[in-house]
Amino acid sequence: MSENAYAKSGVDVEAGYEVVSRIKKHVAKTERLGVLGALGGFGGSFDLSVLDVKEPVLISGTDGVGTKLMLAIQADKHDTIGIDCVAMCVNDIIAAGAEPLYFLDYIATGKNIPEKLEQVVAGVAEGCLQAGAALIGGETAEMPGMYDEDDYDLAGFAVGVAEKSQLIDGEKDVEAGDVLLGLASSGIHSNGYSLVRKVFSDFDLNESLPELDQSLIDTLLTPTKIYVKELLPLIKQNKIKGIAHITGGGFHENLPRMFGNSLSAEIVEGSWNILPIFKALEKYGDIKHEEMYEIFNMGIGMVIAVAPENAEALKKVLNAFEIGKMVKRQDSAVVIKK
């Protein structure tokens, strides 16, 4: 096989080396206690023995960013989509009570463009910094024929640790009378984008809407909020009984994941500010108001269940909204009261 045969097939090995060189400085920023070795090994290593955890339980999560990625590609804006990828993973594991330890990413692309991929990984590193996780490894696969040259996909994998006695088990601990606090989202986050793209398919994404204070594309690409640093201290103080990350499926699919079958979450509409982008989606997409709660976070990215006696103090600490309470099971697991 000739020297340039691989390049002729569409795989640029030298560009791959350049990507690794470019991303090292971003990865280095995320280093934390426990990381062993440097980027470039066959596997990332982490020393659990340095952690002050008596009965460690490892909790892992993996996710991508869905078709929000298509908007980033369309806008040629790649510096924040990595934050979304980290957020989707670490917000899931913090819901189980885990402190994120490390993260790995996977990028598949049709053509290895070092400048673009550096932006993507810089976003991943920023997400890791926000979560307190180390970026200890990853994979960039150049796959001509599988993807168009400008296209790429992004996924990630997070591992966290929890003290066994501090695991969040809402099915066991959440009870009727508990107060539900909602933590504000930064926007749509990373779910429902196939519908979002359809609703706004005929709009100029560089323009704004009467409902928005910035361009539509900037609104749609606002990175997912990471809730780790807000929630972790309270988890360690045993102040939280249940956590629901409001992702795909909105309130109706995600709230029931944090309590048992004998309970319902009673949500009071109007107890928080629904973000303008959701009002725009409902209006321009002709989506039934009730269905919005089955798809989107509606301005609440995370819901926690707390004991009534702790609710007021935690509401202030978290700058949260009191959005409802737990009640004995009614007709459905989630009831939206107007």
Curated annotation (Swiss-Prot):
It comes from the Bacteria. Keywords: ATP-binding, Cytoplasm, Ligase, Nucleotide-binding, Purine biosynthesis. GO terms for cellular component: cytosol. Disulfide bonds: none annotated. Pathway: Purine metabolism; IMP biosynthesis via de novo pathway; 5-amino-1-(5-phospho-D-ribosyl)imidazole from N(2)-formyl-N(1)-(5-phospho-D-ribosyl)glycinamide: step 2/2. Its main location: cytoplasm. It is an enzyme of class 6 (ligase). One of its GO terms (molecular function) is phosphoribosylformylglycinamidine cyclo-ligase activity. Its EC number is 6.3.3.1. It catalyses: 2-formamido-N(1)-(5-O-phospho-beta-D-ribosyl)acetamidine + ATP = 5-amino-1-(5-phospho-beta-D-ribosyl)imidazole + ADP + phosphate + H(+). The keyword Kinase does not apply. It is found in: Cytoplasm. Belongs to the AIR synthase family. This is Phosphoribosylformylglycinamidine cyclo-ligase. The gene is purM.
